[in-house]
Amino acid sequence: RLAPNGVRVTLLEPRQSPGAGVAYSTAEPTHRINVPAARMQLAGDEEGAFDHWYRHQPAFTVDVQALRPDGSVYPQRGQFGRYVAQRFADAAASSGGRLRHLRDRALAFHQGTVTTDGGLQLKADLLVLAISHPPPSLPAQAEAWRHHPALIANPWQPGALDAIAPHARVAVMGTGLTMADTVATLDRLGHRGSIVAFSRHGLLSRGNLSGAGATWPGDYQQGSLR
């Protein structure tokens, strides 16, 4: 949008859809954005652009849980990934070939040349690192458990939680939004065993009062190991 004529931009992204990253690539229906859609848009978009786009998608019609009593919408998180991919496709289509997406991974940059995992050598005057968050990985202290059959290092991996027995006891390292994703997915899968989430600070993500959901029927307790 702001680049002068003659500038060519090549995006190296191994995923099929650019712009979704780890968080917005999820296809899990219980994973939702944690702010109203009206507060999410790309730089340069009009305020509420994503909200307007989503309300005109078939997904909005079939997802009855997206619309809250106050009129705001909280789409499944993958919908924002689709929105970003659509905006990228629109920009690429109108760029006259100046913007392209290569499904490849950059390995090195040396003397103005990017080397990719697929063996390409790309000349570049400028290199922009926009790598976002990497997938979850084990902390160094847990490296000895890497191959333990009960350990799930990346709960966002498709199907990662499917093999957990309905009444198995589950421990989650961390009490942030990834923990919330994990609990929501387990609930959808019918898990009814105990879940213990622990972290150094023990704080939960802030709740949202715009919904009219029923009171959680489970036994929730907060404690400390100190």
Indicate where each model-derived feature is located.
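A conserved short coil-to-beta-strand element within the FAD-binding core of flavoproteins
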Residues: G97-T113
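Rossmann-like dinucleotide-binding core of oxidoreductases
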Residues: R1-A3, V7-P18, V128-R226
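Helical element adjacent to the flavin cofactor pocket in flavoenzyme catalytic cores
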Residues: G81-R100
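Conserved beta-strand-loop-beta-strand element in the redox core of flavoprotein oxidoreductases
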Residues: A108-Q121, P149
